[in-house]
């Protein structure tokens, strides 16, 4: 992440992101227990398509470790698992928006940085950003960062709108009934996550994307309700294949996932997928490796984190997932098309108009969830 982006991010996050000197509800294991004994297992719980399978296979083979993976498609699903204290996993990858309250709930063990020599490759500005919710960078090791945006099938959208000219504010495609009523027939997809979707709606109606004001949240819900009947699906992962296969013409999603959809469509001969980066701004997030409190294979967890921060590994993973890696030297090793793609590394003007998805207090999370469930149920 560039210093310009993080200067913006820090300004947005500082003072409201929840950085705290408070001790988590449950103390983490001490250094000795974090080191763990050598084992032959590693259990990962992560987003789908979030590492090149070849790198995972190579790690397992080179270290004689059996790596198992399970996948989630929303931060809410991950949070429900780790807050039980019985996740059954050694490594998870929550977003900045959720990690802070999970740390304070005592869901994670501290990271032993002495076991991660490649920690020095992490963009220092990213660490400053994460320190706003993880004081001293004790629990989280940045993995990827990216944007929440939208993508279209240009051919299908042009046919539905009767023109190939897009609105000046490209978010009109999903939030303005004038456009959604025309696009509903070819398929619109929203995030299936209030954490991700509400800030986009708040930004669109001119409110603080991280607002905790009840009236603002109600206004955002009302704005989405106006187009609810035109939304075909709510998804935080299925939109990838649906967009690639022509079952959707507009999808809100994670930038990298939308680029994966674009790549899969191109492999099938469809070159009509375009990932948009609205100049009015996008949502910015950071995902980090964290070790659950109940992790058993702790040494292997550290070993895997270190492996992913190797510039060559980080670049290979970044080329596969089409997100920006936390490893600063990796960008120079990435495919040049991706390294110069504004949907992977947004330009300065876009970053200046964007926001970081911040943690919310419990009462706001509860209200957002209530409004979200009502929206999905068309109430």
Predicted segments, located by residue:
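Bacterial signal peptide processing site
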Residues: 17-21
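Ligand-binding pocket segment of bilobal, Venus flytrap-like solute-binding proteins
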Residues: 186-201, 205-276
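Early extracytoplasmic/lumenal segment of secretory-pathway proteins
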Residues: 27-102, 241
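Mature extracytoplasmic/periplasmic domains
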Residues: 287, 292-352
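A structural signal for short loop-to-beta-strand junctions that line the ligand-binding cleft
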Residues: 87-91, 109-114, 118-155
